[in-house]
Amino acid sequence: MANLGYWMLVLFVATWSDLGLCKKRPKPGGWNTGGSRYPGQGSPGGNRYPPQGGGWGQPHGGGWGQPHGGGWGQPHGGGWGQPHGGGWGQAGGTHNQWNKPSKPKTNMKHMAGAAAAGAVVGGLGGYMLGSAMSRPLIHFGNDYEDRYYRENMYRYPNQVYYRPVDQYNNQNNFVHDCVNITIKQHTVTTTTKGENLTETDVKMMERVVEQMCITQYERESQAYYQRGSSMVLFSSPPVILLISFLIFLIVG
């Protein structure tokens, strides 16, 4: 990692040094730079005929009475009564636009749903709510329970509550805590709605929530590892020196 950082530093120093020298070199003069211009584009006292390429009474190449190439009575190339090329009554084509489409409205429900996943839930002591998952396909060993699960899986949670993975020593502790708090919250919600959970429901819900907590742990562990790798990369001395040098070149 250190060798890679040093080679990156050498490459960027060489590249930016060459660009810096190119920027400081004076630009060579083009054809007829600084000399007399024809026709009539030199010093203020030069002979201007015809005046800048237009006809009689045409300061900038427009028709009769056209200061900047527009039609009759058009100061800057617009239609009748158009000062800067806009429509009728439009100064520059940017104001007074009729039938302007309204901006699309943001769907507040989508914003609320996106903010809910991964956010700290108030009143639960630092627990976060995970993203919605598809309920896993689980076989319980007999046809009755398998059929019961397929018919009632919608009654079981599809999101789990959890704490950050860095607060646990291993996966088992994370999953155990995740299962307990998720089942507790779902049971309270179900009871509040007036529904009852049977022993079969509790058994199946424990299996379902356990699988989802394992999946949540794998996701959080991977994200935590990636964040740690990024911090290690950007905290290495060669990368810090490289970033400082680039900032110096941009600002300077």
Curated annotation (Swiss-Prot):
Q: Report residues carrying sugar chains.
A: 180, 196
**One Gene Ontology cellular component annotation?**
side of membrane
- Region feature 5 X 8 AA tandem repeats of P-H-G-G-G-W-G-Q, mapped onto this chain: 51-90
Residues at which Cu(2+) 1 binds: 60-62
Protein name according to UniProt? Major prion protein
How this chain sits in the membrane, per its record, is: Lipid-anchor; GPI-anchor
Q: One Pfam family, please name it.
A: Prion
Compositional bias per record (Gly residues), positions renumbered to this chain: 52-92
Instruction: Identify the propeptide residues.
Output: 230-252
Q: State the protein's purpose.
A: Its primary physiological function is unclear. Has cytoprotective activity against internal or environmental stresses. May play a role in neuronal development and synaptic plasticity. May be required for neuronal myelin sheath maintenance. May play a role in iron uptake and iron homeostasis. Soluble oligomers are toxic to cultured neuroblastoma cells and induce apoptosis (in vitro). Association with GPC1 (via its heparan sulfate chains) targets PRNP to lipid rafts. Also provides Cu(2+) or Zn(2+) for the ascorbate-mediated GPC1 deaminase degradation of its heparan sulfate side chains.
Lipid modification (GPI-anchor amidated serine), residues:
229
**Which keywords appear in this protein's UniProt record, sorted alphabetically?**
Amyloid, Cell membrane, Copper, Disulfide bond, Glycoprotein, Golgi apparatus, GPI-anchor, Lipoprotein, Membrane, Metal-binding, Prion, Repeat, Signal, Zinc
Q: Where is this region: Interaction with GRB2, ERI3 and SYN1?
A: 23-229
